[in-house]
Amino acid sequence: DTIDVYFGTEVPDPYRWLENDTSAATAAWVEAENKVTNAYLAQIPFREQLLKRLTDLANYEKIGTPFKKHGKYYFYKNDGLQNQSVLYVQDSLDGEARVFLDPNQLSDDGTVALTSLSFSNDGKYTAYTISRSGSDWSEIYVMDTATGKLLEDHINWAKFTGAAWQKDGFYYSAYDAPAKGKEFSNVNENHKIY
């Protein structure tokens, strides 16, 4: 057991060993906890009714606040049970909306999320970040705003960042690629601004 001392006060930390998230002991502990949790959840007699009710409550159209960029109007919309909201664009307030970017099309299981969006100063390009399966790691892509065509390059190992445009490029922060097997273990240190 680990005990830290803060200003003369001992603070036990009996679960510090769980911070080693790739150890066999941590994996065994997680497996045992999952077994207990799943056994409890499986025995709830009204579980299916609860799921149906929650699904019914979540199944309504959701529309985000519109925003204007370079003379066009953008807004997010979810038809009800879509995994991710879709970004739409329209040329005027009463114009017809069309899909600008649909993150649901970026994976089969709907777990790719659009995490940030930034337009170049002239509006020609759109930089956006995505994360996969709830990870803090992001990838940055740049597309032609008018055509939706992706530029060739994209950036991996970004985290907690978006694109800050300046003239014909943008700033962002990223990390060195983590060692294989340590993708979800690294602390947030030594990020770089590009």
What are these regions (language model features)?
Residues 1-194:
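Beta-propeller folds
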